[in-house]
Amino acid sequence: MPKILIVEDEINLRDVYSSRLEAESYTISVASNGEEALAVAVRDRPDLILLDVMLPKISGFDVLDIIRTTPEIAHTRVIMMTALSAPKDKERGEKLGVDKFLVKSQVTLEEVVSTIKSVLDSSAAATTQNEQVLGSTGTQRSASASTAEPAAPAPPANQPPANQPPAN
């Protein structure tokens, strides 16, 4: 099952999210601040991070910015969960590369679970599609490399190809 890192400084919310997602058979790790989140993300390489914005030590926005510039975890899916509901906050998250931006007061726990499934499903579909493209490309390359003959040099501009008689 996919691994999810829950980054939430509010212990009750962290416990609720953890319990609910474990019931869906996700493997859960948790962090209570931005600094810890980055360490756990690099160590555990989660498939998805559920990230609060207002965190101690390093804000969720700064955590996301660091995630997107850290090669080992740059492609990790991130859902921001926050009390911030201003459009500028959502825009900031989108500019930093968040996959989904949810306002805590506007979603139920079941909507959070549904969003997580949707983001993970789209991630899996994209991975499968990329593997198919790479796989078929790799197969074509290896097949053509083993069976292709070197191309014959082009004839000079004023001469017909060698296998055709000259025109009179």
Residue ranges and their predicted role:
Residues 11-29:
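Two-component/phosphorelay signaling modules centered on CheY-like receiver
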Residues 33, 59-62:
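Acidic catalytic/metal-coordinating carboxylates
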Residues 8:
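Conserved acidic carboxylate
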Residues 62, 85-102, 106-114, 118:
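Alpha4 helix (beta4-alpha4-beta5 surface) of REC/receiver domains from two-component response regulators
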Residues 44-50, 55:
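Active-site beta3 strand of CheY-like receiver
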Residues 27, 53-55, 79-80:
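The short loop immediately C-terminal to the conserved phospho-acceptor aspartate in CheY-like receiver
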Residues 39, 61-74:
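Short amphipathic alpha-helix used as the core "switch/output" element in two-component signaling
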Residues 121-168:
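CheY-like receiver
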